[in-house]
Amino acid sequence: MAKLCAHQVSVVYASRRGALTALENVSMSVGGNEIVVALGASGCGKSTLLSLLAGFQPPTSGRVSVDGAPVTGPGADRGVVFQDDALMPWLNVIDNVAFGLRMQGVGRDARNARARDVLRLVKLAGFEQHRIDEISGGMRQRVGLARALAADPSFLLMDEPLGALDALTREHMQTLLLDVWRETGKGVFLITHSVEEAVLLATELLILSPRPGRIVARHSLDFARRYAAGESMRSIKSDPRFTEIHLALVEQLMRETEEV
């Protein structure tokens, strides 16, 4: 399976106060059927790391690669989902999902067939012709996810995709993300501020320190795989170990913040 890697990447920005280091010597990887979650305080470089993986910007030092080949820009092998869904309101749902395929020159019938497939995957079958202003915030995020899946990327890069949703919709979306992951086997890199969400979704959890962003801890977790194997969400969240890990991570993040 393909592997997306960051090799000792650092990002330094120029500012009026001098050089500002956003990331420092960060190494990590995402492979197929993995969910790597980055967790840390605001300003710790999580979104900068995603930007490097997506090819939106180069690192100041270090390198990013897919299967050893350097990442020099965005690519169809990496689908990106943002907190702001960035949908085009003048297009209906299916045309939003198929837009990237259209830009790649895929014919109408083929791109619409693929769009319908991924809309079924995110449980939006029947909403193909709806305008964007006719659907809810959670549904808009599902359209954004479907759009990222339409080109069948090897990796999904998700920058706080659930951050703007209400609590109940967020829980539904967490379950949907795990369903999509189980169905597709994609490699996922996800950013969140929610410790509970990180514990639930991550197969590997990266804790980043406040600026400069460094990976200060890595945790292997099995709750997502337990769900994928058929265990209920209720059973997982009622597991005392889930609560223990959640509380321990909150304490760790608080210590990291206090040390700044």
UniProtKB/Swiss-Prot annotation:
Q: Does the keyword Disulfide bond apply?
A: no
EC numbers for this chain: 7.6.2.7
Pfam families of this UniProt entry? ABC_tran (PF00005)
ABC transporter domain sequence ranges: 6-235
PROSITE patterns linked: ABC_TRANSPORTER_1 (PS00211), ABC_TRANSPORTER_2 (PS50893), TAUB (PS51250)
- Positions annotated to bind ATP: G40, A41, S42, G43, C44, G45, K46, S47
Which is one Gene Ontology cellular component term of this protein?
plasma membrane
Please state what the protein is called.
Answer: Taurine import ATP-binding protein TauB
UniProt xrefs under CDD domains: ABC_NrtD_SsuB_transporters (cd03293)
- Cellular compartment(s): Cell inner membrane
* Family assignment from sequence similarity: Belongs to the ABC transporter superfamily. Taurine importer (TC 3.A.1.17.1) family.
PANTHER family the UniProt entry points to: TAURINE IMPORT ATP-BINDING PROTEIN TAUB, TAURINE IMPORT ATP-BINDING PROTEIN-RELATED
Under Gene3D superfamilies, the record lists: P-loop containing nucleotide triphosphate hydrolases
Q: Read off the InterPro entries from this record.
A: AAA+_ATPase, ABC_transporter-like_ATP-bd, ABC_transporter-like_CS, ABC_transporter_ATP-bind, P-loop_NTPase
Q: What does this protein do?
A: Part of the ABC transporter complex TauABC involved in taurine import. Responsible for energy coupling to the transport system.
Q: Assembly and partners?
A: The complex is composed of two ATP-binding proteins (TauB), two transmembrane proteins (TauC) and a solute-binding protein (TauA).
